[in-house]
């Protein structure tokens, strides 16, 4: 039976609306307005999760988006389930189901908790050190390390919810609805600015809305009462739009911001049907006012992570907002006045406070004196040295601090408690400010970073600007607004203010302990289990940059992005390394500020891409003949043609044998085709390709290689001269659009003097390739009035012809190494001509083949595929294609780069053939190639680019790139795989018919 810690009053909850929900399979009750965190605390549930590395028990620590511990899984169905959700931001609804993450079999008994006992083996960077020996065991270690990675479970079914995007334009965007944000929004709206006010919470007012003691007054009213009236007034303003439950995720340049508006997450699931869940707001504002507030800092001391340890401000909010006591025996631990505000609020509600520990020795504070009137014991100049209790704190130990704060002295005092509130000061929430390009400065007096240089048309006000007390905010905000909005006065000039906060603070980043050095666990990052000891270890091991320490220790790399711990990490680095905090800088604040669902990012752009599928004129024939398809760029290309129960390997073996032994037919319509005309067409090709084109005769074809300006292979294809000033160029399928754009760019910007006209005709023609020993016999039947003799129609030539009354072009070119012809005909006749070829080849067992067989056939011949056997680092020389680079031409694109010292190195990766010792063993494409697996570290020489089993050679073949490969012919190399090492021999990349006898047969 759980306790009920609900108080009689709570500002935001509706006690007439009772809600049942489940957590870890148990049913609890809360009220409308509760968050999951407040409802669990009301039911005396503090243990909600386990930490990432050590699986230590973790409890609710905050009341907002900075929560590092209470990260839960929502829903239990496979489509709507959502991991890593902060319980502090989940508004409960009827039949809500939530569960703890990162624990098994349960949060109360987690087998992973054994990690805590082995923590000496798991320090910062343990994955680089602890499990490195013996090396042969790494694969065993790796399995368990990977298995333990991650927190929650991702959905496995399609998301049933609806998401939208919306564009908003406004004169002034105000981020945050605390007291400064309300003042800014009202002032802007009343001065004629179209204003948008957004806040991540469901209610307006920030923390001031529950600052209701006599020690904080505005115009002789409690600050909360005054603010409530202001909120009621701004809701009536016509040119002010207010959006709650709206979190600004990203702040980009020129005042473009992304915000997520949460519309239905607080509703029961059955009420969400047909409604938009989240809306991604794309906001463009003329001016932006950041009033994002500040985040309370925890304290770093030994065992500061137990369930029941919360931020002092969170305890206050749960009491004031939700009517929840976080414990029955409360202790507060502080270094500033904020904890006394909490104490006064708890006293007013009858909540017991056992003691307050204040590490300041002398405090002159009205708030402290008020607390002392209630006979609450205050330990001045003390610190918490340890806490006790496994699943919930039950006791603390305290000791007096030395004068310099570096040690503890005197006797230990034990105090029992079930809740410890900590307050280590406040950190301005500058995350969005820095995303916008703003620059920070370090303020020594309160050891914090505040905005310094603002981008144009942006202003930071209130606590996020370093004004951390009520009187500072109320005095500075009107002046900032007058300057920023270019107005003469505001209604907030000359407010009467009572603010009793004493700004004195004793900041000690790492509080001392009475334990032996190194035996403590003082947590800096609660979610990732990064401790002060880890940070010091990183410094001892040579890390100095805050970004390096962050990554080595994983500090600030959890779902909370270090909102609580990063300042402490900086402070500990500063003290340990003897560096000034202002000189250390901060880690980079990256969007999103709080996590976004993929649904929010995608919006309505779900299902198939709007990007079209392109189909060849022969596509319907491929479908009728049961072809399997693959996507090549936008094209659907026939991949292979299985017969009966053939798998891909069997089909490809059959197709490739047929193409070599008799005849094969390929739909090559997807190749890019560019019609090139103009008096300077030949000169244009000379500049574009590496080889010479001026003397290419009409009716002849030539293979060309196109480079980038850096000398690296960009594309390839065959270009045919149709007339004196008329060519047709083919490109790779995937590169067609890019090549067309690149050529147009050169014509328009680099060579405008050339008279050349380019037209993309890819879709105009169907291209049918017939190859094999019987190809001539087949095309002779299809085009009987054309002379196909070798004398009349040699390799790399073309002829105009007619099939019936339809004009076509026939090229004798080959991508297989076989005697081959390509028929190019107007697209509408493509399928008809294909069927004629199939009919003509029936007696020769003509076999259609797809892209997979095409790849195998060209690899047997050593022909490259740009993008598979090349990347953006390969030159023609690397590909053993020196022959295609003209030595006579004055210039071509990329020529100068071919002679740089880097590109003429002999040890560059070069294309070679690879033959396995076991001819039946097929290498994996992408596999690394090494010479010596016993050398440490193993030197990677290259990788496999293409690999197949060749039925025509009865062995496996592969192409690869190897450093200095041209000079390694016949040498043995090794392909290290997961379970074995495969021995290979470096060979000529041309595996079949090097003399081209088949091509010219």
Residue ranges of model-derived segments:
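Residues forming the flavin
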Residues: 2-613, 764, 979
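A short, contiguous, amphipathic alpha-helix enriched in charged residues
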Residues: 38-48, 679-696, 781-786
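Short amphipathic beta-strand starts and helix->beta connectors
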Residues: 445, 509, 654-661, 706-716, ...
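Acidic, proline/glycine-enriched N-terminal capping motif
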Residues: 568, 575-707, 712
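Conserved, structured C-terminal
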Residues: 615, 619, 623-624, 637, ...
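N-terminal glycine-rich flavin-associated loop
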Residues: 666-679, 721-728, 768-770
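Well-ordered mid-protein domain cores that form the structural environment of catalytic cofactors
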Residues: 695-725, 730-742, 746
């Amino acid at each position: 039976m759980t306790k009920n810690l609900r108080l009689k009053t709570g500002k935001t909850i509706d006690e007439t609306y009772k809600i049942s929900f489940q957590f870890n399979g148990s049913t609890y009750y809360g009220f409308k307005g509760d968050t999951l965190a407040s409802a669990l605390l009301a039911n005396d549930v503090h243990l909600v999760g386990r930490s990432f590395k050590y699986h230590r028990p973790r409890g609710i620590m905050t009341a907002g988006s900075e929560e590092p511990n209470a990260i839960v899984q929502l829903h239990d169905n496979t489509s709507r389930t959502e991991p890593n959700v902060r319980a502090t931001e989940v508004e409960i609804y009827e039949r809500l189901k939530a569960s703890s993450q990162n624990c098994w079999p349960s949060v109360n008994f987690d087998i992973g908790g054994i990690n805590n006992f082995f923590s000496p083996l798991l320090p910062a960077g343990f994955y680089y050190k602890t499990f490195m020996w013996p090396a042969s065991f790494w694969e065993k270690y790796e399995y368990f390390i990977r298995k333990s990675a991650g927190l929650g479970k991702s959905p496995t079914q399609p998301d049933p919810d609806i998401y939208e995007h919306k564009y908003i334009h406004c004169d002034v965007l105000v981020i945050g609805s605390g007291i400064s944000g309300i003042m800014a929004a009202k002032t802007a709206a009343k001065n004629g600015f179209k204003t948008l006010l957004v806040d991540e919470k469901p209610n307006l007012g920030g923390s001031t809305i529950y600052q209701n003691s006599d020690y904080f007054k505005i115009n002789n009213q409690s600050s909360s009462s005054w603010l409530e009236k202001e909120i009621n007034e701004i809701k009536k303003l016509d040119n002010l739009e207010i959006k709650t439950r709206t979190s600004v995720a990203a702040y980009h340049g020129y005042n473009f911001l992304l915000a997520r508006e949460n519309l239905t997450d607080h509703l029961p699931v059955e009420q969400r049907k047909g409604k938009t869940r989240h809306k991604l707001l794309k906001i463009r504002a003329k001016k932006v006012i950041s009033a994002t507030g500040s985040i309370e800092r925890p304290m770093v001391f030994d065992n500061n992570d137990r369930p029941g340890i919360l931020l002092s401000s969170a305890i206050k909010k749960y009491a004031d907002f939700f009517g929840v006591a976080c414990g029955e025996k409360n202790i507060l631990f502080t270094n500033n006045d904020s904890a006394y505000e909490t104490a006064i609020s708890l006293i007013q509600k009858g909540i017991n406070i056992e003691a307050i520990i204040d590490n300041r020795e002398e405090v002159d504070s009205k708030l402290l004196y008020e607390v002392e009137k209630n006979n609450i014991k205050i330990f001045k100049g003390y610190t918490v040295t340890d806490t006790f209790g496994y699943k919930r704190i039950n006791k603390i130990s305290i000791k007096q601090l030395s004068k310099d704060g570096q040690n503890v002295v005197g006797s230990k005092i034990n105090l029992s408690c079930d809740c410890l509130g900590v307050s280590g000061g406040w950190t301005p929430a500058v995350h969005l400010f820095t995303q916008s390009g703003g620059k920070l400065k370090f303020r020594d007096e309160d050891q914090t970073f505040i905005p310094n240089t603002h981008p144009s048309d942006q202003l930071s006000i209130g606590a996020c600007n370093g004004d951390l007390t009520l009187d500072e905010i109320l005095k500075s905000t009107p002046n900032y607004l007058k300057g920023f909005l270019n107005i003469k006065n505001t209604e907030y000039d000359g407010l009467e203010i009572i603010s009793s906060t004493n700004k004195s603070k004793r900041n000690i980043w790492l509080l001392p302990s009475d334990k032996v050095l190194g035996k403590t666990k003082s947590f800096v990052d609660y979610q990732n289990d990064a401790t002060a000891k880890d940070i010091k270890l990183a410094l001892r091991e040579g890390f100095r940059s805050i970004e390096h320490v962050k990554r080595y220790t994983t500090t600030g790399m959890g779902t909370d992005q270090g909102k609580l711990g990063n300042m402490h990490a900086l402070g500990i680095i500063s003290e340990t390394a003897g560096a000034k905090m202002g000189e250390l800088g901060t880690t980079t604040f990256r969007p999103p500020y709080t996590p976004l669902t993929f649904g929010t990012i995608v919006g309505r752009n779900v299902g198939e891409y709007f990007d079209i599928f392109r189909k060849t004129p022969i596509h319907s024939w491929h479908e009728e003949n049961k072809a399997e398809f693959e996507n090549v760029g936008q094209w659907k290309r026939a991949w292979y043609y299985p017969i009966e129960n053939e798998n891909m390997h069997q089909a490809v073996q059959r197709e490739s044998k047929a193409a070599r032994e008799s005849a094969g037919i390929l739909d090559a319509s997807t190749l890019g085709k560019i019609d090139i005309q103009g008096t300077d067409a030949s000169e244009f090709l000379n500049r574009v390709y590496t080889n010479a084109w001026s003397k290419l005769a009409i009716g002849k074809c030539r293979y060309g290689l196109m480079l980038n300006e850096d000398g690296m292979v960009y594309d390839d294809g065959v270009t045919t001269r149709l007339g004196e000033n008329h060519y047709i160029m083919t490109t790779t399928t995937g590169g067609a659009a890019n090549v067309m754009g690149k050529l147009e760019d050169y014509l328009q910007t680099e060579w405008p003097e050339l008279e050349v006209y380019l037209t993309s005709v890819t879709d105009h023609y169907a291209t049918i390739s017939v190859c094999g020993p019987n190809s001539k016999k087949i095309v002779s039947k299809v085009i009987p009035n054309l002379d196909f003799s070798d004398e009349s129609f040699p390799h790399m030539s073309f002829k105009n012809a007619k099939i019936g009354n339809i004009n076509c072009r026939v090229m004798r070119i080959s991508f297989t190494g076989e005697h081959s012809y390509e028929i190019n005909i107007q697209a509408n006749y493509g399928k008809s001509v294909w069927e004629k070829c199939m009919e003509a080849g029936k007696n020769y067992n003509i076999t259609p083949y797809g892209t997979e067989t095409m790849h195998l056939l060209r690899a047997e011949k050593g022909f490259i595929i740009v993008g598979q056997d090349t990347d953006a680092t390969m030159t023609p020389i690397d590909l053993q294609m020196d022959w295609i680079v003209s030595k006579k031409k004055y210039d071509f694109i990329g020529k100068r780069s071919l002679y740089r010292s880097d590109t003429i190195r002999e040890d560059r990766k070069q294309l070679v053939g690879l033959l396995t010792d076991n001819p039946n063993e097929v290498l994996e494409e992408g596999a690394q190639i090494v010479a010596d697996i016993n050398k440490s570290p193993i030197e990677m020489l290259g990788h496999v680019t293409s690999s197949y089993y060749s039925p025509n050679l009865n062995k496996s073949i592969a192409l690869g790139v190897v450093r200095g490969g041209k000079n390694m012919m016949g040498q043995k190399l090794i392909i290290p795989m997961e379970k074995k090492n495969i021995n290979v021999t470096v060979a000529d990349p041309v595996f079949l018919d090097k003399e081209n006898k088949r091509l010219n047969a």
